[in-house]
């Protein structure tokens, strides 16, 4: 899953990524579903990439090192979430300030290019639970800053509703082939 606005509108397109020198600009797959309704309230922004590239390393982990144990349940305002963005090149964490039926807003900074990255919650056992896909950020004091200013908060599209809608299963550290 990724942010829908990361796809070219109206067409399935190939997804390529520079995987840190391991597979420079390897084809990962193809967008098979894209919903990019806008950037307001409950408008959805989600894309499904079908992994069909050759030699795509698949790891049920964040940044290839922190195992994903499942999908987070019972999110609450005040809990800490983290996100990883390719634009930032690092993770950032902050408290949840708002939860809706399809989104979660939390106080983690970011920048353009972070969209589509994972949003997760650290668990007591050292694993993380998947929460959402980063779709946008903002600054309540700078309206329409675009990429000119670093975001002060992040918004994620929750993954659970889309896993259910598209009948997908989360690959976790426990379920991954060994």
Predicted regions and their residues:
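Catalytic nucleophile loop of clan PA
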Residues: 109-134, 142
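A short, polar/proline- and glycine-enriched secondary-structure boundary/capping micro-motif
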Residues: 10-15, 115-120, 141-148
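Residue-level detector of flexible, active-site-proximal loop/helix-junction positions
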Residues: 88, 103, 137
């Amino acid at each position: 899953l990724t942010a829908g606005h990361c796809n070219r509108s109206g067409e399935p397109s190939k997804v390529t990524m520079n995987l840190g020198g391991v597979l420079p600009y390897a084809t990962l797959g193809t967008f098979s579903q894209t919903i990019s309704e806008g950037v307001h309230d409950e408008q959805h922004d989600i894309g499904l990439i079908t992994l069909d590239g050759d030699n795509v390393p698949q790891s049920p982990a964040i940044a290839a090192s922190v195992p994903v144990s499942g999908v987070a349940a019972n999110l609450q305002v005040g809990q800490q979430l983290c996100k990883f963005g390719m634009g930032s090149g690092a993770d950032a964490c902050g408290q949840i300030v708002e939860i809706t039926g399809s989104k979660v807003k939390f106080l983690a900074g970011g920048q353009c290019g972070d969209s589509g990255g994972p949003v997760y919650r650290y668990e007591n056992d050292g694993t993380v639970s998947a929460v959402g896909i980063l779709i946008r950020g903002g600054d309540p004091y700078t309206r329409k800053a675009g990429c000119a200013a670093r975001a002060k908060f992040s918004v994620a599209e929750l993954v659970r509703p889309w896993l259910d809608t598209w009948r997908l299963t989360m690959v976790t550290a426990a379920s991954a082939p060994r």
